[in-house]
């Protein structure tokens, strides 16, 4: 199949026009079109939430003493496994 000079020129023109239609990677138009970088959120726990472990994990005596101070309970223990970034033992009162 032999291409004529006109078909080669038309093909070249189409390819050149599509290359010019897309903005360059670092042009101001492409930078504006990008989404802004995500802002890192910081979370500060309220003062009451920091104290809710009652010694779990690590000090079951704090948990036991906490439960003894609650009316109707004889004591307490740390219940559940410690899984990093997922969960930690909680103070269970009996």
UniProtKB/Swiss-Prot annotation:
Domain of life (superkingdom): Eukaryota
Residues annotated as signal peptide: 1-25
Compartments where located: Secreted; Target cell membrane
Gene Ontology BP terms: defense response to bacterium; immune system process
InterPro entries: Defensin_invertebrate/fungal, Scorpion_toxin-like_sf
GO cellular component, one term: membrane
Pfam family, one: Defensin_2
Renumbered residue ranges of the record's region Interaction site with membrane interface: 57-60, 83-90
GO MF term set: lipid binding
Disulfide bonds: 56-78, 63-91, 67-93
Sorted UniProt keywords: Antibiotic, Antimicrobial, Cleavage on pair of basic residues, Defensin, Disulfide bond, Immunity, Innate immunity, Lipid-binding, Membrane, Secreted, Signal, Target cell membrane, Target membrane
Disulfide bond keyword on record: yes
Propeptide: 26-56
Main location: secreted
List of residues binding beta-D-GlcNAc-(1->4)-Mur2Ac(oyl-L-Ala-gamma-D-Glu-L-Lys-D-Ala-D-Ala)-di-trans,octa-cis-undecaprenyl diphosphate: 54-56, 66, 91
Record has Transport as a keyword: no
Function as written in the Swiss-Prot or TrEMBL entry: Antibacterial peptide potently active against Gram-positive bacteria. May act by selectively inhibiting peptidoglycan biosynthesis through complex formation with the cell wall precursor lipid II (1:1 molar ratio) thus inhibiting cell wall synthesis. Shows remarkably activity against resistant isolates such as methicillin-resistant Staphylococcus aureus (MRSA) and vancomycin-resistant Enterococci (VRE) at the concentration of micromolar level. Does not act by destroying the membrane integrity, which is consistent with its nonamphiphilic architecture. Acts more rapidly than vancomycin.
Entry comment, domain topic: Has the structural arrangement of an alpha-helix connected to a beta-sheet by disulfide bonds (CSalpha/beta).
Family as reported in the entry's similarity comment: Belongs to the invertebrate defensin family.
Protein name: Fungal defensin scedosporisin-2
